[in-house]
Regions:
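Short, charged, low-complexity loops and linkers
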Residues: 1-5, 74-77
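Short, contiguous alpha-helical
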Residues: 6-10, 17, 25-71, 113-168
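Hydrophobic alpha-helical core bundles mediating ligand binding, dimerization, or RNAP-core interactions
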Residues: 9, 13, 20, 88, ...
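Short, flexible helix-adjacent loops and helix caps
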Residues: 21-28, 104-107
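A structural signal for long alpha-helical coiled-coils and helix-turn connectors
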Residues: 24, 99-103, 144
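Acidic/histidine-rich alpha-helical segments that form the ligand environment
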Residues: 73-113, 120-135
Length: 168
């Protein structure tokens, strides 16, 4: 059975992507300073997913260019939405088997980096990922509103139907 925290991550990813519905390439690449553009935000979350669930968890780095272009503190850029969405989709799909196999005891295990236990545990990384998605979901909605987009999705979607609270 999939851990409830992983189910919440999946719902959060879905809501993040729902916030991109109807967004064209040109608007996805527009920067309203000092914010990054929406497409950069997608790449940034792909970077974090890859870092936590592929690199830290499985020692895989399938998209080194994502690691370089969208890491925390990386310079602003205006990538195409199609490019970063495709990378995001591949990264999140590659993370699924690992996420599906997590147990509560796995989630309190320390992340090992450079052969040494770090101060992080996997459950906290999942929480960090969830909260980071919501941060950028709100930022993306603000950018879209500033660009004059209307009839945007309301949040937090159908949490009661799709991701209600479930005990372990």
């Amino acid at each position: 059975m999939t851990h409830p925290l992983v189910l919440q991550l999946r719902f959060t990813r879905k809501e993040f992507m729902r916030g991109l519905e109807g967004l064209g390439e040109a608007d996805a690449q527009k920067r309203i300073l000092p914010m990054n553009c929406i497409s950069w935000n997608v790449g940034h979350l792909a970077w974090q997913e890859q870092r936590y669930f592929l690199y830290y968890a499985q020692n895989q780095l399938p998209f080194p260019q994502i690691n370089e272009a969208f890491a925390y503190g990386a310079p602003a850029s205006t990538p195409t939405l199609g490019e970063v969405r495709a990378a995001w989709a591949e990264i999140t799909e590659a993370a699924e088997p690992w996420l599906d196999s997590r147990t509560s005891s796995d989630l309190v295990a320390k992340v090992v980096r450079n052969g040494k236990p770090s101060r992080y545990i996997y459950g906290s990384l999942i929480l960090r990922m969830i909260y980071h998605y919501w941060y950028h979901t709100g930022e993306n909605m603000a950018i879209r509103q500033s660009l004059g987009h209307v009839e945007l999705p309301e949040f937090v979607g159908d949490i009661d139907g799709e991701a209600p609270y479930k005990p372990e």
